[in-house]
Amino acid sequence: MKYRRLKGTNDGGPICANAPDAFALKSASKITLQPGEEKRFIFMLGEGNREAGKVMREKYSNFENVDRAFAELHNYWERKCSKLQIETPNEGMNTLINTWTLYQSEINVMFSRFASFIEVGGRTGLGYRDTAQDAMTIPHSNPEKCRQRIEELLNGLVSKGYGLHLFDPAWFEKKEETSEDEFKSPTVIPTSEKDRIHGPEDACSDDALWLIASIVEYIKETGDVSFADKIVPYADGGEDRVYDHMKAILNFSEEQVGADGICKGLRADWNDCLNLGGGESAMVSFLHYWALQNFIELAEYLNRTEDAEHYKKVAEKVKAACDRELWDKEWYIRGITKKGKKIGTMEDEEGKVHLESNAWAVLSGAADHDKAVKAMDAVDKYLYTPYGILLNTPAYTKPDTSIGFITKVYPGLKENSAIFSHPNPWAWAAECKLGRGDMAMKYYDALCPYWQNDMIEIRESEPYSYCQFVVGKDHTAFGRARHPFMTGSGG
């Protein structure tokens, strides 16, 4: 094999994607393999200047160095994967959980779900909820990275208790003066410090609530109890203990409620396209209740009885409001618009049943047993498909700004009645909590990419990666998976 430089600038710099030989390596001679014969070749692809390329090429033109690097890479992942191994009769579950779901989670924590081979993306930095969700998946395999991400999120928390939905951790780092020009991002991001700290009306109401569980999981997994009392700055100035950051988050959600005691959706909740015109979110109220339970567990462990008792009373109030306002005969509604219309009711022609609110009613423990069973029965009846669970149904077809941008999304895609992967595990966990393991496994196998490899002409995506969504039944491409790795499902 002869090395061929990619066509580009004379100094081996950036290349043009439209150039005829862009991203192509060609063999200088034909390679013939006889039956059973093996030959080894070293294939190199990288980016950098000419000098860096020479150094790397020289090092890895040696098979011994290549083998050593490969062994180091193997050992690196073996150490991580060995922290959690399962053995079940389900081959797909074994393969995914023992290797690929951890790998996907590690990648997401590293790149905050914006590293993709197929999507350019429109952001840079850390997505608050994404990073908080991903951090809680790796305390056993990568506690250092888990803690780093948690501290960055704490730095990105405003003292009032809400997170900056998208921020760059470098904003809050003390940097030495440099004469070098800063990197010019192609993505539009806040350019002045005053633009970086948005007000509560632009906060996503669920963002910081995820961080409560991330912190508790980190402490439980590592035993790093002292972390709760570490002093960490706020995004808008001042500093406090990690423990007090958590209290600020809970207090913010307690304050940001509508007339009926249900948490306001603010800019949006987990479903960015369903903002209910700034109304109230059932999912966030259940998430608030769940975060309260996590915090109470930590407060009791730390013998901070007064805090534990206070937040138990808050939790009782949240649970009562959810029971009073969100139950609709057979399932939980999704929310209430700013104009007071309930969304996700039996009377709705579109968006009748939603996955998030029903799964979280059960997961949080806010639903009593009978309602929990009915809610998950509704999920099975209305939302289950052979490829996974729909986010909602029937799909929206009529634009309605009081509900949100979801009503303008093409039916069966993304938030509008697609099989959005991330909420599917919430349903698995909810069924496990109800003691209905067979239902959980039915849902698991439906979404599991391993079991979809024999229908690759439909799925069109890797058999080892959960994708952001699978096209729903209201679309002609029902079953097609899109945006691999761009999801928290792996956790």
PLM segments and residue spans:
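Trp/Gly-enriched beta-strand surface patches
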Residues: 1-35, 94-98, 105
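Short Pro-Gly-centered flexible turn/kink motifs
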Residues: 31-49, 288-291
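Terminal connector regions
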Residues: 46-90
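Inter-helical turn/loop segments and adjacent helix faces that build the functional surface
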Residues: 50-55, 221-235, 292-312, 434
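Low-complexity, Ser/Thr/Pro/Gly-enriched N-terminal "stalk/linker" regions
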Residues: 71-122, 148, 152, 252, ...
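Carbohydrate-binding/catalytic loop surfaces
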Residues: 116-125, 166-206, 235, 260-281, ...
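Aromatic-rich carbohydrate-recognition surfaces in CAZymes
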Residues: 126-131, 135-261, 282-289, 417-440, ...
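Catalytic cores of carbohydrate-active enzymes
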Residues: 164-166, 287-403, 444-480
